[in-house]
Regions:
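Pepsin/retropepsin-fold aspartyl endopeptidases
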Residues: 1-222
Length: 222
């Protein structure tokens, strides 16, 4: 079965109404978290309350990688839509340009991206809806391009200086802004073996298919 959901894009986050739940669809969260199970999931109450405080108070569910494990999910930011297909059904970007192998499951989605001419291991996180991130020594080699305010469940709100770096995708180069996360959050990312987190930098520029059953991520031109 294939379902098409109209998404509310709030602060760049994809939020859908499905089966009586208002769900924030987030590849950066390993779990499905709601009021029924929030005390049994690591940091469950914290993450759910943070989403309600900083994104939308009507959110009833964090829909993370537990959900993606059995589905193929296509994010279309320009149409404000999410297409969800069961494991045996087909869904794909209209104009695919690049495919990446996924590792890191079930906790995270890791992909290898060529950033500034070097292959970097990155976390793909649709929850990174305001800024993408790289460790400081890499990010600050880019061109300064502004400042935004972001938030994190464990840190609250914080300012982020952005630096533009070239990212190679399917034979073309896209300039994407990256910031530097607070030190302890960046340390957690580095301990996972990655050097950064990317979300909005991909899905604003490309349709993104997250196909966990086949451990692949596919980008397509809008």
């Amino acid at each position: 079965m294939v379902k098409i959901f109209d998404a509310d894009l709030i602060k760049g986050h994809f939020i859908v109404n499905d089966n009586g739940k208002r769900a924030l669809v987030d590849t950066g969260c390993p779990y499905i978290i709601n009021d029924e199970n929030k005390y049994s999931k690591p940091h469950g109450e914290l993450y759910l309350n943070d989403a309600r405080s900083n994104v939308d108070p009507t959110i009833s569910e964090f829909r993370g990688l537990e959900y993606f494990a059995q589905h193929k999910v296509l994010f279309d930011y320009k149409k404000a839509a999410i297409i969800v297909a069961d494991q045996g059904d087909d869904v794909a970007p209209v104009h695919p340009v690049a495919e990446f192998a996924i590792s890191g499951l079930p906790e995270r989605i890791f992909i290898n991206l060529a950033i500034e001419g070097k292959v970097r291991k990155m976390v793909f996180d649709t929850g990174a809806s305001i800024a993408n991130y790289l460790t400081e020594s890499i990010a600050k080699t880019g061109t300064p391009c502004g400042t935004v305010e972001d938030f994190h469940p464990q840190k609250g709100k914080f300012p982020v200086d952005l630096f533009s770096l070239p990212v190679e995708v399917g034979g073309e180069t896209v300039d994407i802004p990256f910031g530097v996360q607070p030190t302890d959050i960046d340390r957690d990312v580095q301990m996972s073996g990655a050097v950064g987190v990317i979300g909005v930098g991909l899905y604003k520029n490309f349709q993104v298919l997250v196909d966990l059953p086949n451990k692949r991520l596919v980008l397509g031109r809008y």
